[in-house]
């Protein structure tokens, strides 16, 4: 299992009237980390990617502590917990050392560019995604 770590800078505009990062902004931070793992960094390493053929099916976020603005980037660990026939689940932890600010999951589905319909993940895509696979532990 390999977790991707994205160091995400916070922006002043991420904060809300309560002085912490707004819940909606967390989705944007998670998107940045997910895009870095799936599309940006693999291309610089000349590795096959899904070429943008994904849609978000569902997001789930658990906020565990308020995150206030700071000049240092926040670490977002990203990995894959489930690989299905046409979809997979990406998990995240927004953290600083042992302090976890949020845990989240996103279900993504592969789509056909021409038809816009769901399609099965190809063997090479599954193999590439599997490099980040860490099965969830059931309680």
Please identify what each model-predicted range represents.
Residues 1-75, 81-139:
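Terminal targeting signals and extreme-terminal segments of soluble enzymes
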């Amino acid at each position: 299992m390999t977790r991707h770590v994205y160091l995400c800078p916070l922006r002043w505009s991420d904060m809300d009237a309560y002085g912490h990062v707004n819940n909606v902004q967390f989705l944007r931070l998670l998107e940045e980390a997910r895009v870095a793992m799936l599309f940006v960094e693999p291309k610089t390493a000349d590795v096959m990617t899904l070429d943008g053929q994904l849609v978000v099916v569902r997001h789930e976020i658990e906020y565990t502590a308020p995150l206030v603005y700071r000049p240092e980037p926040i670490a977002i660990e990203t990995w894959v917990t489930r690989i299905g026939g046409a979809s997979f689940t990406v998990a995240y932890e927004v953290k600083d050392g042992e302090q976890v600010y949020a845990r989240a999951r996103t279900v993504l589905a592969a789509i056909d560019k021409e038809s816009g319909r769901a399609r099965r993940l190809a063997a090479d895509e599954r193999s590439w995604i599997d490099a980040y696979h860490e099965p969830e532990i059931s309680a």
